[in-house]
Amino acid sequence: MKKVIIVDASVTPSGSYTHLLLDRFLQTYKKQNSSVEFIDWNLNELPVGKISYNTQNASNFFSFENSDYYIDALKTAYGIVILAPMTNFNYPASLKNFIDHVFVANKTFQDKYVTKGASKGLLTNLKVVVLASQGAPLGWYPWADHVSNLKGLFGFAGVTHFESVLIDDTKILYKDKNKQEVVDLFAHKVDQVANNF
């Protein structure tokens, strides 16, 4: 049975743009994929999303329960769907903490300093979808493209199938619309991504 992991980094418990995008994605995806096991990782609740790498925990940060467990799950999963709203010009800190736990040399990528030549990603099995939102129009802060950053990270780890849906400009263009109305404007794009997954 295919396993799809939902990585929830939204700081809003429910009803956010990214949660509503996920609802639409799953509605479409499940129509053609009835025998899929969905695994929910809410990074707001799991230690892997709460614990940041620092001098106090450097010696045990990459423990089995907070690192290898998740790496092993990613290596056997069909794909992951990441909820990534922009927070302070980047994805949420919980997602950064998760990335720090799972992007580990010789586990999710071969480090160029260990293997002669370029680094080699080890998550080649994985398909990735990012469902994202941001208040500013895309491009207002060229240095703050959190979706592009995630694409680069997962590409480095060997992922070749990466798709995203970004609702940008939520604080200006869509400020007078309710969230579901806005998500409905992106329904066609979400359906395309779900059908390609």
From Swiss-Prot:
Organism superkingdom: Bacteria
Catalytic activity: 2 a quinone + NADH + H(+) = 2 a 1,4-benzosemiquinone + NAD(+); N,N-dimethyl-1,4-phenylenediamine + anthranilate + 2 NAD(+) = 2-(4-dimethylaminophenyl)diazenylbenzoate + 2 NADH + 2 H(+)
MF terms (GO), sorted A to Z: electron transfer activity; FMN binding; oxidoreductase activity, acting on NAD(P)H as acceptor; oxidoreductase activity, acting on NAD(P)H, quinone or similar compound as acceptor
Listed cofactors: FMN
Binding locations of FMN: S10
One Pfam family cited in the UniProt record for this chain: Flavodoxin_2
Coiled-coil zones: none
Entry EC number(s): 1.6.5.-, 1.7.1.17
Cofactor note: Binds 1 FMN per subunit.
Keywords, alphabetical: Flavoprotein, FMN, NAD, Oxidoreductase
Function: Quinone reductase that provides resistance to thiol-specific stress caused by electrophilic quinones. Also exhibits azoreductase activity. Catalyzes the reductive cleavage of the azo bond in aromatic azo compounds to the corresponding amines.
Family from the record: Belongs to the azoreductase type 1 family.
Quaternary context: Homodimer.
UniProt protein name: FMN-dependent NADH:quinone oxidoreductase
